[in-house]
From Swiss-Prot:
Keywords for this protein: Cytoplasm, Lipid metabolism, Membrane, Nucleus, Transmembrane, Transmembrane helix
One MF term in the entry's GO annotations: protein phosphatase regulator activity
Subcellular location: Nucleus membrane; Cytoplasm
Top-level taxonomy: Eukaryota, Metazoa, Ecdysozoa, Arthropoda, Hexapoda
Protein name per Swiss-Prot or TrEMBL: Nuclear envelope phosphatase-regulatory subunit 1 homolog
Family, per entry: Belongs to the CNEP1R1 family.
Functional description taken from the UniProt entry: May form with the serine/threonine protein phosphatase l(1)G0269 an active complex dephosphorylating and activating lipin-like phosphatases. Lipins are phosphatidate phosphatases that catalyze the conversion of phosphatidic acid to diacylglycerol and control the metabolism of fatty acids at different levels.
Amino acid sequence: MEPSACEDLKAFERRLTEVVSSYRPSTFRWRKLLAVVLSAMSMCTAISAWYWLRDPRTTVVPLTESLWIHPVFTVATLTLVVLFILGIQKLVIAPQIITSRTRMVLGDFNMSCDDTGKLILKPRQSNNNST
């Protein structure tokens, strides 16, 4: 392998490990925040859904009025829906997304990478067409 190609690979590997490692602290913070928020919102949704379904007025009044009568259920459910529509769960797995997409691209060049961004050079496949 040429020295310039080797230097390019090393520079690419340094940059990839830098990008992956820079996501780790924010990913950890998002995981903690998401765990707290999702548990709180899930508990609120579950408990308020129980009261909402047990309310005798639920079967009589229109849905919008029923949701207006039970604001905790409405807000908790809307919060969960909005969080997932915005893709909050992707912030938790950002480094894995980056490394998996990089592996797909590197596969064309007979390479791969580990979860930290270190390059893995695969041995070349030999073409034995001799009979």
